[in-house]
UniProtKB/Swiss-Prot annotation:
Something else known: Negative results: shows very weak activity on Nav1.2/SCN2A, Nav1.3/SCN3A, and Nav1.7/SCN9A voltage-gated sodium channels.
Tissue expression as described in the entry: Expressed by the venom gland.
UniProt KW Secreted keyword: yes
Name used for this protein in its record: Delta-buthitoxin-Hj1a
Cysteines paired by S-S bonds: C14-C65, C18-C38, C24-C48, C28-C50
LCN-type CS-alpha/beta domain sequence ranges: 4-66
Length: 66
């Protein structure tokens, strides 16, 4: 399966906000990624970034979280 590095998304194009790398690492691995970290996302906070996340998993795309 193809993979990519990206911000993993919840339903409705919303990111997973975070404070700790360990939270994102566990979340990303649970969704099939190699690893994850808590990265700067916008001025409103940080979000989980996954490394080698399977293409079948949703990622943050341009547009609002709704």
């Amino acid at each position: 399966e193809e993979v990519r590095d990206a911000y993993i998304a919840q339903p409705h194009n919303c990111v997973y906000h975070c404070f700790r790398d360990s939270y994102c690492n566990d979340l990303c691995i649970k969704h099939g990624a190699e690893s994850g970290e808590c990265k700067w996302f916008t001025s409103s906070g940080n979000a989980c970034w996954c490394v080698k996340l399977p293409k079948s998993e949703p990622i943050k795309v341009p547009g609002k979280c709704h």
